[in-house]
Amino acid sequence: MMTSLQLETSLPAVEEQVQREKDNDSAEDSHTASTTPTRIPHPAVARFRRSASLRLRGNPAELGLRAEHCPAGGGGFSSRAKLTAIPSSLETRSHPVHLRRNRSWCNLGHKTEQEPEVEASTEALCNAAQCLSLDKEALAPKVGNSSMANGKPRNLSLQLNGGSDISSSGTSSSSSNNKESSPRTTRTPRTPQTPQTPQTPASGVAASVAETPHSCIRQGNCVKANQVKLSTLHESKISPRTPPVTPDSPSTYLDDDIDSMYSFATTTSGRSTMSCEHPYVARNGTTFSGRKMKYVVHCSNYAGQVGPDYLTPTQRAQRQIRRLKELLCIARQDLEQKDTELLRLTREVVELRLFKASLSSPEERSASSDAVTVREAELKTSQDVSPIVDMVDEGNAKGSPRHLSRQQQQQANHSLQAMQMSAEMQSSYADSGHFEDLTMSSVHSKDSQTQSEACGTATPDGEADVGCGAGGDSASNLENYELQRQELISMYEHRIEELIRSQDSATSDLKRSHNDKVEALLQKLAECNTRYSDMVPDYEQAKQRIRELEKQLEDLQRKLIEHEEKQNKMYLHMYQQGQEAERISRADQALDLAQRQPESKVSINELLHQLQSTQDELENIRASECRMRECGSNHALLTAKEAISLWVLGARKTIYRRLLEAQKNRTHVDPEVTLQFLKSAIFYFLTDKENSQGHLQAIESILEFTDAEKQKISAANRTPK
């Protein structure tokens, strides 16, 4: 950040030299006009303006080396520079260092060395300093030099500027460096050089100081101590770009410049080097503000920003304007939406009022369609009646006067934005922050004009504000709106009446159809009841029949069980009889055998064979008994084979027993047993066809047939019948 103190000097001693330069105006006219805006307004053609820029850069050692070149005292560091004639020994340097003005924000802290183009620039600087009578080299203390040399490096730029640089930089190297460091700032042309004037001895100034003792912190730089009148007012010509100032004193800007320098000198010890101590600050965002509406030096809040983040006051103001315009557009859109909603709600209210009026009797309606008296006691509930609310037609909304006014507003906004974009493009060269130096017009006047145009495009109602004929258009729009409103009211009233009539007819038809359906359903229900009453006795009879059949089933099951038991008993009795008959027959055979061969004896082999056959039959009987146990629950009958095997077994046992008894007492024969045995053999011979041959042999043995008779019987059985 760079602090600039600008001071323009105009001395009577120099005016004579200004008159001498009028002959050379045509040759140097191109160099006198400054195209770059400056902070302090100046006349269009200034004959004598001197700019002294003292920049202290680097370290204390460098300041110590330059102490002899800065006779102002304090080691070349003071709040106001005192410029005297440079000794002749310094004029012969091959590379003298000249200080030039650098307005770029990027070159802060850099020292610019240039080759002098004209030797007269140094002389002009020295003569101007001599005319100011600020030579206090003899009175300056040497202690300040050492103290400043031992201090920290400073970054100070004191500019006593009337709009031009001290050293004219016209070479290509200096211009290229200036362009690289400040691409957005144009180069300031050089100031026409002033020929050397007679030097004013410094002893006169010292004598005047001695005569009027004065002491302050500014030491020899104080204006009161020097008693030199410094005027910053341009006495030659006033430029149209010069802003209005308060004519308090001839030295209008001097007090503020002195305050700025004083604030810098008093705050270097405890605060930042570039801070400001002004009792007033900028009010409108520009440098043209202050206690007396003068040019002051103040610290900007955006000074620390560099690169793309930095915005000039013009850019900040334009960004603020764009943001406000966006907010204005958003507010207008919200207003349009609210207007549309208001129109829709108005129509709904009208429709509801008409619908409410239609529900009352015709004699209670009033003549006006807007105000309708309704008998509240006869209104139906919300379940019986539903209000008719139709949506607003889009075509009517687009044809409304508000929609037309919105279209006009949008067109005006587009044209206004185009004008503002063109104005921003034209004023882009003024991004240095000097609002008052714009070539077109003042920023404040342009902002006020833009604001008036933006405010003129819309009224508080959101309708277009037209300059010429606005009253007539508004009246016609209101009349059209009222006509449309009346037409809508009449149309909706007619529609509501038609809907009510159609609804009544539809309701009556629906009731009739529903009554017919209800009667048909009631008739069907009666028929169903009759059928049900007829079917109930049948159902009871069927249930009784089912109970009777269940009883009969139980009786039949009991009878079946009894019959099976009887049959089993009969089979068992027949089996027992068969066993007894077999026993008798075996006994008879054994008896016959014993009678025929009394002397023969039964061999052991025959007995063993009979015993084996008997054991086999016993095994069969055991198996049959097991099957009988398994089937005993079902009361199953024995088969014929099982009965015969059991009978044969029993008969053999009986025969064996009787054989043994016959052997014991051969004389005893039981005819009853023989008869019973014969009876059983004949019965089974006739009934059991499968074992008929065995039964036949038993009969033959019981009846004691001979072998010839047995052969004839067997032959007769083999012949087919």
Curated annotation (Swiss-Prot):
Residues 17-31, 362-379 have a biased composition (Basic and acidic residues). Expressed in the third antennal segment and the maxillary palp, with increased expression near the cuticle of both olfactory organs. Also detected in the second antenna segment. In the brain, expressed in the central nervous system, with high levels of expression in the visual system including the retina and optic lobe, and uniform expression in the cortex. Detected in the thorax and abdomen, with increased expression in the ventral ganglion. In males, detected in the reproductive tract including the ejaculatory bulb and testis. It holds the Pfam family GRIP. Residues 668-716 form the GRIP domain. Residues 1-42, 143-210, 360-379, 393-428, 441-471 are annotated as: Disordered. Residues 511-569 form a coiled coil. Disruption phenotype: Adult males appear unable to discriminate between males and females when choosing a mate; either because they display increased levels of courtship behavior towards males (when presented with only males) or they display the same levels of courtship towards both males and females (when presented with both sexes). During male-female courtship, they also begin courting virgin females earlier than wild-type males, suggesting that their increased tendency to court both sexes may also be due to an increase in male sexual activity. Disulfide bonds: none annotated. GO terms for biological process: courtship behavior; male courtship behavior; mating behavior, sex discrimination. Residues 441-454 have a biased composition (Polar residues). PROSITE patterns: GRIP. Keywords: Behavior, Coiled coil. Residues 161-201, 406-420 have a biased composition (Low complexity). The name 'quick-to-court' derives from mutant males being quick to initiate courtship of both females and males. In adult males, modulates sexual behavior by playing a role in sex discrimination and maintaining normal levels of sexual activity towards both males and females. This is Protein quick-to-court.
